[in-house]
């Protein structure tokens, strides 16, 4: 199928994982691609409305095991409106709260593999395939411990 390229000039926030982090978390390529990054992306989008005045439908996301510009596993959360609306920026400014709420929601959810309460998204272009709740939870826990209390911003 030949589809035209779509471009949206907007604002967003992202995180990358260095190789030593991937090794530390003992995630293999399949878990990253099929799971952890994608699950973390969905969970972060689902919980951003608790810290920014928006709806999950106002947001978009992308997760790649090797983004062409970063060269690293990368998750993007972006505003779904041209020019941005400030939602992802607000999430970045409230990073500790956003990460904490997201990690706690995924960790507390009683399901085993993922469900709409934790990592499934009603707007997933991949039909909520290739998700790993456990790898996503581990990534969120790592992000919270790395950025949460330190409030690191770049």
Indicate residue ranges for each PLM-predicted region.
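Extended, highly charged accessory segments
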Residues: 1-154
């Amino acid at each position: 199928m030949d589809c035209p390229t779509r471009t949206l000039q907007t604002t967003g926030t992202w995180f990358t994982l260095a190789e030593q982090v991937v090794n530390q978390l003992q995630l293999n390529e399949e878990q990253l691609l099929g799971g952890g990054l994608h699950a973390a992306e969905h969970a972060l989008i689902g919980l951003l409305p608790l810290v920014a005045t928006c709806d999950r439908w106002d947001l978009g996301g992308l997760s790649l095991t090797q983004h062409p510009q970063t060269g690293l596993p990368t998750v993007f959360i972006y505003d779904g409106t041209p020019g941005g609306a400030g939602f992802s920026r607000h999430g970045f400014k409230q990073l500790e709260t956003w990460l904490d709420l997201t990690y706690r929601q995924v960790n507390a959810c009683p399901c085993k593999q993922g469900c709409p309460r934790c990592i499934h998204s009603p707007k997933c272009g991949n039909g909520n395939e290739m998700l790993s709740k456990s790898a996503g939870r581990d990534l969120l826990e790592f992000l919270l411990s790395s950025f949460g209390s330190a409030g690191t911003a770049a």
